[in-house]
């Protein structure tokens, strides 16, 4: 299996990976061959799930070549991987030069056996046997040679040869465009609807028998034998069924225009209807939340009608259809109207609340976007501006520093070995705060101006008597509760908007959101608070401090994202 050419790079493509294979798994395997520079598992941009292939880069090209020789087809977590040289030029990959197609392969032929058979004719860049979801061979595969000469030699020698008792076909690879467009779907069963009540099997057969042999006709009826207005006709040939659909669909039959089309399974119909619906309303349907309780359907339509023609406007209500849920939808006839409405209305005060207006999205898309944001932060290490208590350890909520110029400490997404205590807490201010279960925090020696600091009473700077640890803790807690109470009474939307930066707005909102989230999710309050502060506008964050029901929904969404990771 050795390759005899010098690689042009030290980058390898590793394919056919299971979704759960991570960079760490690959590093443990490939670093045994030589020093690995970096590894990247390619992931979906929305869901961040693995696309089942990766790139492994070595510092040394010889190490990469050795890894290709020794690790190709090695099982990784139970499934054989496929390794080839990384080819960054897409024109070379898609040109078809040197690419060979093999079919009628025995089910026992895998990547390695195919490689061993065809490597005699030249240097192979990639080799693959196509498999199904159960990892069973589909009976065909591809071999990509370095040169077209090697490919021609393989075709001449192996085409028609018996391999494992089966005569294989070997020929030049052709793209789907070269092979021609896929043939249209053939069918023999035709679905009819909008039939008159007096139309029975005999009348329908009389209409359709001119097109060809009919094997079966059924008109659906209720318990009393009354026609439901639809039925099926099954033909002997697909050509006859096709002619019926082309000629009879929309024609008047017994006083009504009938529908004739290919009979579909329920799952096909639902997928088609869903696609039609999503295409029709894409870019024109708006999602509005934080709606004042006094706003009804008519008022919502009136407010948004200035931007274009509205086809529907609805405020969602509870099961009793009496109380507004605080959100709704407005649908326009054109995307530019919807875009203008989003630009003008998002954040505008209607009634007593600022509206949140955005293009409507499916729940799975919203969740994927939130998950992507969270994953990107975890991966790149972007820090969030958050109060120092956004961890899961402290029982008490820490007040803001006395000096208004002091910036709140930043915090990374929680790593595996994180112990749940505040990150970067200024020394001398919260050093003696009690933590969960009433246990005092144990401080080891820390460097402060080059001097180690021991746990104990604070130094007497002002000439006053040192305050014992226990007494100082009590004072800190009392100050915490007093500060939180004062901040809560002073919180209003305008004061937050007037703050000079988004970081300061996040701090003000975070001080109120954190204890509310901590009530239901004490272990994850820090993470969830950070996710909300980063992904939501100020107006909506303020609303969450006032509406427990909306906050509970957001907490639930965040838990779903965290749970999937």
Curated annotation (Swiss-Prot):
Q: Name the UniProt key words of this record, in alphabetical order.
A: Cytoplasm, mRNA processing, Nucleus, Repeat, RNA-binding
Among the GO biological process terms of this entry, one is: mRNA processing
Q: Where is the composition biased (Polar residues)?
A: 440-454
Q: Name one GO molecular function term.
A: mRNA 3'-UTR binding
Q: Does the keyword Cytoplasm apply?
A: yes
- Where do the segments described as Disordered lie? 435-466
Q: What is this protein called?
A: Polyadenylate-binding protein 1-A
UniProt source species: Dictyostelium discoideum (Social amoeba)
Gene name, per UniProt, is pabpc1A
